[in-house]
C-alpha cells in the first residue's frame, strides 16, 4: 500500500513536469543508474540505458552514446518491426547490434485484465535468457529498446533493478513515468514522421 500511495502522489505531483529523453530523437531513453540499492550503493550510471526504438538517431545521439561507452545495442522488436523501421545504430563504429525479438508485448493486450499476465509472458519469452546474457557479458555500457520503451523494456528494467537490489517503489516508479515520457514527442523527431 505504501508503494501505491507513493506512486499515486508522484503521478499527481509530476503530471505537468517535463520529462526529457537522454537522446534528442527518442522519447524514452533513460539511465538505470543512480538507484539506491539494499546493499548501500547506487546502480552505476550509464552502464545500462532503456529506450524506445532509435530509428532516426542523430549524429549528436550517436556521439552521446559513444562518449558514454555504450557498446552494445539490444533491440527487442520483432523481425517485422525491425524490417519496417530499422535501427539507426546497426552500423555505428564501436557498437555491436543484436536483435532478440520479444513477441509478447509487441501488441496491445485485449483487455486490462490481460496486462499483468502479459508482463509475466514477456519475462518468460525464450529470448530473455539471451538478452540477460548479452547484458551480463557486454564489454561496456548497454542500451536496450523495444518500440515505445514501455512494456518489454519496462520488464527488462524491472528485472535488472530487482537483481541490483533497488527498492520496489523505485522499480514501480521507473515503469510508471514512462507514460509521461512517451506523451512528449521530441521536436527534432516530429518532422521525421
Q: Residue spans of the language-model regions?
A:
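Single conserved hydrophobic/aromatic residue that forms the stacking wall/gate
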Residues: 1-14, 191
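Cys-dependent protein tyrosine phosphatase-like superfamily
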Residues: 15-143, 155-193
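Substrate/cofactor-recognition hotspot
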Residues: 149
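Conserved SAM/SAH-binding loop-helix junction
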Residues: 152
Amino acid at each position: 500500500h505504501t508503494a501505491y500511495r507513493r506512486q499515486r502522489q508522484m503521478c499527481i505531483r509530476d503530471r505537468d513536469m517535463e520529462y526529457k529523453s537522454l537522446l534528442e530523437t527518442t522519447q524514452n531513453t533513460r539511465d538505470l543508474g543512480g538507484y539506491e540499492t539494499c546493499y548501500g550503493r547506487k546502480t552505476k550510471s550509464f552502464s545500462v540505458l532503456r529506450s524506445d526504438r532509435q530509428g532516426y538517431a542523430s549524429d549528436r545521439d550517436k556521439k552521446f552514446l559513444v562518449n558514454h561507452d555504450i557498446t552494445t545495442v539490444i533491440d527487442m522488436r520483432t523481425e517485422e518491426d525491425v524490417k519496417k523501421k530499422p535501427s539507426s545504430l546497426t552500423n555505428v563504429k564501436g557498437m555491436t547490434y543484436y536483435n532478440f525479438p520479444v513477441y509478447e508485448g509487441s501488441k496491445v493486450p485485449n483487455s486490462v485484465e490481460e496486462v499483468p499476465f502479459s508482463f509475466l509472458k514477456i519475462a518468460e519469452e525464450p529470448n530473455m535468457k539471451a538478452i540477460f546474457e548479452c547484458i551480463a557479458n557486454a564489454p561496456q555500457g548497454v542500451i536496450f529498446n523495444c518500440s515505445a520503451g514501455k512494456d518489454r523494456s519496462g520488464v527488462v528494467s524491472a528485472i535488472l533493478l530487482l537483481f541490483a537490489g533497488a527498492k520496489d517503489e523505485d522499480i514501480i516508479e521507473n515503469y510508471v513515468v514512462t507514460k509521461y515520457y512517451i506523451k512528449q514527442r521530441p521536436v527534432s523527431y516530429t518532422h521525421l514522421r
